[in-house]
UniProtKB/Swiss-Prot annotation:
Entry GO MF terms: lyase activity; metal ion binding; phosphoric diester hydrolase activity; toxin activity
Name of protein: Dermonecrotic toxin LspiSicTox-betaIII1 G
Family: Belongs to the arthropod phospholipase D family. Class II subfamily.
Annotated source species: Loxosceles spinulosa
GO biological process: killing of cells of another organism; lipid catabolic process
Catalytic activity field: an N-(acyl)-sphingosylphosphocholine = an N-(acyl)-sphingosyl-1,3-cyclic phosphate + choline; an N-(acyl)-sphingosylphosphoethanolamine = an N-(acyl)-sphingosyl-1,3-cyclic phosphate + ethanolamine; a 1-acyl-sn-glycero-3-phosphocholine = a 1-acyl-sn-glycero-2,3-cyclic phosphate + choline; a 1-acyl-sn-glycero-3-phosphoethanolamine = a 1-acyl-sn-glycero-2,3-cyclic phosphate + ethanolamine
Main location: secreted
Cofactor, how bound (note): Binds 1 Mg(2+) ion per subunit.
């Protein structure tokens, strides 16, 4: 999975897809009432990127719906996963819960179009902390209440704050969440040890819990040697500002026989057995 980082403007969807991304990550901010409002990343952000670009969240969802709906003139066949980086730092339990309900409603109305020719991409909810776990409860409850629980098959979760992995897995078990991605990373401006990432990969490969880790990705990785290093560790995804670099490396002799880009036929909620 080649995950284009900080794709917060409409024009950037095509820009990153043209560079080879089959997934895009965009930020989601909330107003004081826990309502999702913009695709916005404040200063600071990654080195070499311009912070502060944004769209209205619902308008962006409608735009990417068209990009991921077969038959639409602007359909991008290879774009198969949307990651929502949910900006909920400091939210209380009730605020997290309300935010989950609101995001579910907006996905239902503006992306899935309530079942009428909606987008087909998988959705990855990137929740900042296990302290925000009630977001997921609110999200699921809203879809179930409105009679659209079938969309939960398209949705997975990632806790992104580099917290203790065992604590995360305990929360996932309590939430009975099976569609689990686990991230580890830091801004491209800084270096980070791979100890926790290696542990996540080990838990993915050795765990047999239905609520365990299915995919592991790292962020944000932009340099050729670093991309190769992480691929050798056995990650499933790379979040990057330069998708073309990851695509180039996947075609190198070392990787071309064992790795390929994911397609819509690859289930992101299952472990990959190469």
């Amino acid at each position: 999975w080649i995950m284009g980082h900080m794709v917060n403007k409409k024009y950037q969807v095509d820009e990153f897809a043209n560079l080879g991304a089959n997934a895009i990550e965009f930020d989601v901010t909330f107003d004081p009432n826990s309502k999702a409002d913009y695709t916005y990343h404040k200063v600071p952000c990654d080195c070499g990127r311009t912070c502060g670009k944004y769209e209205v969240f619902t308008e962006f969802l409608s735009y990417v719906r068209n990009k991921t709906t077969p038959g639409h003139p602007s359909f991008r066949e290879k774009l198969i996963l949307l990651q929502l980086d949910l900006k909920m730092s400091g939210f209380s339990d009730s605020e997290s819960n309300e935010a989950g309900k609101d995001v579910a409603k907006k996905l239902l109305n503006y992306y899935w179009n309530r079942g009428s020719n909606g987008g087909r991409a998988y959705i990855l909810l990137s929740i900042p902390s296990i302290d925000n776990q009630l977001f997921l409860k609110g999200f699921k409850l809203q879809l179930e209440t409105e009679g659209y629980s079938e969309y939960l098959e398209k949705v997975g979760v990632d806790f992104s704050a580099n917290e203790d992995l065992n604590s995360i897995l305990n929360v996932l078990g309590r939430l009975e969440e099976e569609h689990v991605w686990q991230s580890d990373g830091i801004t491209d401006c800084l270096a980070r040890r791979s100890t926790r990432l290696r542990d996540a990969i080990k838990k993915r490969d050795t765990g047999d819990d239905r609520y365990g880790i299915k995919k592991v990705y790292t962020w944000t990785v932009d340099y050729y040697p670093s991309i190769r290093y992480y691929l050798r560790l056995g990650i499933d995804g790379v979040m990057t500002n330069f998708p073309n670099r990851v695509e180039y490396i996947l075609n190198e002799e070392e990787f071309s026989g064992s790795l390929r880009m994911a397609t819509i036929d690859d289930n992101p909620w299952e472990k990959y057995v190469g």
